Amino acid sequence: MATYMANAKTVSPRWLLVNAEGKTLGRLASRIAAILRGKHKAEFTPHVDAGDFVVVINVDKLKITGNKTQDKQYHHHSGYPGGLKTINFADLQAKKPQRILELAIKGMLPKGPLGRQLYRKLKIYAGDQHPHQAQQPELIDL
C-alpha cells in the first residue's frame, strides 16, 4: 500500500479561535505554529499546507515569565549605516501588542513559500473583537 500524501483538494481547513488572555507567550506560540502547520491532523504532510486558520484575540493580555518584560529586546534594521532599531518587550506591548505574537510564531514556521502561505492563515487582534464571525471559528483552549 502506498503512503498517503495530502494535497490541496483533500485538505479542508477549519477556523479556530484562541483566547490568549493569561497564556505564556512561547507555549502559546508553539501550539499555534503546530496548528498552522497541520501537525495535529492525521493527514499531515510536510510539504502541503494542511493547517487550519487561527484567530487569536486578547494578545494584549499575554504573560511573559521572569524579567523579560524589561530585558527582552526586539531588533530590526533599516538597511542604512546606523539604522539598527531596538525596542523592549514592554514598549512593544504598549504600541503593537499583536506584533509580539506575530514574531514568535513566524520564527517557528518554515522559511520559504510554504511558511509565508501558512503565516497568511494567522489573524491576531489585541482586543476581544474580531471581524471573522462569518467564518464561525470554534473556540479551542490551548
Swiss-Prot record:
Sample GO molecular function, one term: structural constituent of ribosome
InterPro entries, alphabetized: Ribosomal_uL13 (IPR005822), Ribosomal_uL13_bac-type (IPR005823), Ribosomal_uL13_CS (IPR023563), Ribosomal_uL13_sf (IPR036899)
GO cellular component terms given for this protein: cytosolic large ribosomal subunit
PROSITE patterns in the cross-refs: RIBOSOMAL_L13
Keywords carried by this UniProt record: Ribonucleoprotein, Ribosomal protein
Domain of life: Bacteria
GO biological process: negative regulation of translation; translation
Quaternary state and interactors: Part of the 50S ribosomal subunit.
Similarity comment: family membership: Belongs to the universal ribosomal protein uL13 family.
Known role: This protein is one of the early assembly proteins of the 50S ribosomal subunit, although it is not seen to bind rRNA by itself. It is important during the early stages of 50S assembly.
Record's protein name: Large ribosomal subunit protein uL13
Gene from which this protein is expressed: rplM
